[in-house]
């Protein structure tokens, strides 16, 4: 495969005669994104695991995602949270620890998740809709420049 260059890999994978798990694993170990060209009927959990270990973005081509697969991906690359089919709190937490900007891929970020994200990178406040005062305070404490994304104070109960 090396001599063909990366642009032709998808075509070559489709033309493969040997669809053994061993051969397919060798392919995805070279480039995890080749998973997209492997027919679903030949994919196994083992092939999925090798693909996502080589490139966490391969998660987008995994039909049957497990919690463990998703955790492995977001621990390496937080923004792969966007490919997680069934987000759970622990997966979101791990993604945020790795890359706080992945808050934009949380379906419904909790207060705790927002606090975690801004405690690591205060500038992430710009990606949070209607942050609580506590989230704002944490963001500014982490990075003074986060103030530029905090437009106005939260309404008080008297307003």
Predicted segment positions?
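Alpha-helical scaffold segments
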Residues: 1-159
